[in-house]
């Protein structure tokens, strides 16, 4: 069976050391570090991943690259007296994934658009980069697209902030069912944050 062009691109990203993707990323990230936190890109860096997640090269669809710092929460130190070990500054794990934070920031930057999905494009010791696919739900080309017009319905408004994207559903524990998931539904907060 013959492989498509997208299959070759996907295989290249799976083993970046052997295929030259690592060297290409190393060069690109030098430019990305100088850029702002949210940058609109002309075309996706990983066309195979973008197409698999619903990207189409048409009006009403935008791809932005978002830079988010790595690691746990940057909690501020307490002003009140207590010993350092009890300040709760270090080793604070976030309740959201970095990918989910990237989606929310992209949505805030483009308030007239909705997040379709996102994917990883690179990381170094300090930052991670994700490309977020955004759709304009009121654009005629989206409304007339039978595979994407579901996002124009009112129920999908603000889907990234409500954890309805793929990264959001995963972070809320909705990928699992059965034993061990009793506290995941109806939501994490409904069960006093005992789900995670």
Curated annotation (Swiss-Prot):
Disulfide bonds: none
GO molecular function annotations of the record: RNA binding; structural constituent of ribosome
HAMAP family documented for this protein: Ribosomal_eL15
SMART domains, per database record: Ribosomal_L15e
Cited InterPro entries: Rbsml_eL15_core_dom_sf, Ribosomal_eL15, Ribosomal_eL15_arc, Ribosomal_uL23/eL15/eS24_sf
Keywords: Ribonucleoprotein, Ribosomal protein
Transmembrane annotation, as ranges: none
GO BP terms in the entry: cytoplasmic translation
A single cellular component GO annotation: cytosolic large ribosomal subunit
SUPFAM superfamilies named in the record: Ribosomal proteins S24e, L23 and L15e
NCBIfam families in the record: PRK04243.1
Claim: Ribosomal protein is one of the keywords in the record: yes
Database matches in Pfam families: Ribosomal_L15e (PF00827)
Family: Belongs to the eukaryotic ribosomal protein eL15 family.
Protein name: Large ribosomal subunit protein eL15
